[in-house]
Amino acid sequence: MKTIIYIFLLIPFISLSQGISVNVSQDARLALVGDERGNKAFTTNVNVGAEFRGLQKGSSYFLMRPELEYADLKGGELYRMTANFGYTFNKWIKDVDFTVTLGGGMLSRYELGGLHTQANLQTTWYFTKGIGLFLDSEFVQRIDLPNKFVGYSGKIGIKIILR
């Protein structure tokens, strides 16, 4: 039932958007070396998002990007749902996009539930038509982090433009 509700909520965005892409990323540090909290290399921390693009205005366009994150961290799994809004600047350098977003949402970890906020800076390089690699710098405020003010993660991922 939840899936049907989500589909009906997304239909207006799908029909009004000027383009849709799918993003899949992994936290680079957790994938390669682990972290100081005891998570080893190859720790799963996957983000999946859908990007709905607005009309192109000059060198940029507005976007909305809902995301889901799952991380199998030491001490407990993390689930996050986020709604991001921002701008992509795609006319400065050929085949390169620069995206700035702000967002917020809900998370669940250690039997804790709560809100989080985040800011992202993303650079995408399109190596072929409709497929690109991106680096995403994320600054996030989460209740489950020891430093509850701001945490940082660097993600690497792939973006596929569907239309």
Predicted regions and their residues:
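Short beta-strand micro-motifs in enzyme catalytic cores
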Residues: 40-42, 77-79, 115, 150-152
